[in-house]
Amino acid sequence: MRGFTLPVWVVAAAKAAVKVLIGESWQSHEVIELLNNEESIVVPIRSASILDNGEKALGITNCDPGECLDLTRGLEIWVCLRYIENQQIISSDGLELEPWLKIIPGYGVGKFDLTNDISISEFARQLLIVNLKPYRKEGYSLNLEIIFPSGQELAEKTSNHAFGVVDGLALIGTQADVQESASPKKLQSTIHALRSRCAESSFTGSLIFVIGENGLDLALQYGIDSSKIIKTGNWLGPLLVAAAQEKVQQLLIFGYHGKLIKLAGGVFHTHHHLADNRLETLIAFAVKERIPLSLIKEFEEAVSIEAALSILENKDISTAKKLWKRLAVEIEKRSIDYVKRYETSSIEIGAVMFDRARKIRWAGNYALKQINSFGLKLEDY
């Protein structure tokens, strides 16, 4: 079954709302125009209605990512929309996409911590503009507030904080169709990209695996050479083996600590729906590091890896550093051992982890050697 990204469902709710606002009856489906002359799609609508004596309208959809394992499945999306006269003085809150279109992040929608601006991809921006442009009204701006009622709760299960996004889910997505990072098709396309990169005449035997779009964004911000980067999904194990088969000599895994800690526990498919051993792994290595039992018990009650890390850093920063250093070394060891199960190889695999504050914090021994050659250093508080 075909699934669509979050921006598509937001645009569908907005389009349903604006149509009832101008007096049309709501329909059970809306046609969404895509970018770059792609064929339009039909998206189901849950409901739409006018509010405040016809001054506003509300459109509601439920996100459906198709067969993809995604925490946005069933997410209820509200878009509240109204026309405001251009001469009218209004709040400066929100993002002006066009002189006639302003978007306001409501409850449960992610905002950048430093600027308070909505976290929205360029694809989502353009999709809103294309689909709402026919409803421009001379002398008025179209204001829409996006609300995800369960957005704050779901955001706690993501790495949004690692990229400076707070208060809810980011409105990201670079295309209409869901890219299934956990699917076999995605794995095969990534292996193909890896082999193509290794076949290039400029290939030097060194690669960097970055985990997801967010990992890629941060790696590029740090100035890491894009010609060495392969963006991966959740199938890390087979990709490590494929790298060894292509005679990669040095491989760096660059990712969020909440993802990579799974490798320290021997889990090489990192999607949270299929395996989530993070707190158990942290506790196991805390025992090996002889961390006091009272602290370990606090880990057990932590709601996330980040919360457990904060507990330890607040109590004993030096012990926290030792624990995460040990985890990074274990990730390297487990990764090399995984490869050797399937392939005879002398590949060196390094692991470097960043935290929710977008700081590179921890690295194993192989990783330290590699990042030093890039001119990067671990950051500390």
Swiss-Prot record:
Superkingdom classification of source: Bacteria
Pathway noted in the entry: Cofactor biosynthesis; adenosylcobalamin biosynthesis; cob(II)yrinate a,c-diamide from sirohydrochlorin (anaerobic route): step 6/10
Reaction catalysed by this enzyme: Co-precorrin-5B + S-adenosyl-L-methionine = Co-precorrin-6A + S-adenosyl-L-homocysteine
EC number per UniProt: 2.1.1.195
InterPro entries: CbiD, CbiD_sf
GO molecular function: cobalt-precorrin-5B C1-methyltransferase activity
Keywords carried by this UniProt record: Cobalamin biosynthesis, Methyltransferase, S-adenosyl-L-methionine, Transferase
GO biological process: anaerobic cobalamin biosynthetic process; methylation
HAMAP family: CbiD (MF_00787)
UniProt similarity note: Belongs to the CbiD family.
Listed name of the protein: Cobalt-precorrin-5B C(1)-methyltransferase
